[in-house]
């Protein structure tokens, strides 16, 4: 498995796939080696769980989730990341990526089709611009999840708390 927290590995993948970050999507990828294991731990990446991951980046958090959970289904809006994920996540048989917009995805149907007999949790490192809409959608929906674990920018957290 590639060390997706190593800046040289990331630079190599950026160059290999000609990938540039999209400001419109607010892309920011996790590279701190201590953060992803903690998010996975708090996000119920353990036996008996299916995890919905919102946004994958290059798969840094995805890999940590897939190490522990029975299944990880990632919803990734940027189709340019799919070939990168084929490379970085190829060793995980319990990982699946769906190229879709989380705000237009029927999560109840996804849970029924992908996580039969499993508890479900949601995990994400959310971009600033979509933090509030995604969190509100998850909280207001009727989806059967045990936990929602998201990492957000400090400013997004302050804005969200001010709205409540």
Predicted feature locations:
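Catalytic cores of RNA-modifying enzymes
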Residues: 1-164
């Amino acid at each position: 498995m590639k060390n997706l927290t190593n800046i040289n590995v990331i630079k190599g993948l950026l160059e290999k796939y000609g990938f540039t970050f999209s400001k419109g999507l607010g892309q920011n990828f996790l590279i701190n080696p201590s953060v992803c294991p903690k998010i996975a731990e708090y996000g119920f990446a353990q036996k008996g769980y299916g995890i919905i991951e919102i946004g994958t980046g290059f798969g840094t958090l995805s890999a940590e989730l897939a190490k522990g959970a029975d299944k990880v289904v990632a919803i990734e809006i940027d189709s340019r990341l799919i070939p990168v994920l084929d490379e970085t996540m190829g060793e995980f048989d319990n990982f699946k990526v769906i190229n879709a917009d989380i705000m237009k995805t029927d999560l109840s149907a996804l849970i029924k089709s992908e996580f039969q007999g499993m508890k479900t949790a949601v995990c994400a490192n959310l971009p600033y611009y979509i933090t509030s809409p995604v969190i509100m959608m998850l909280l207001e929906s009727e989806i059967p999840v045990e936990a929602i674990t998201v990492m957000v920018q400090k400013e997004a957290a302050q804005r969200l708390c001010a709205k409540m």
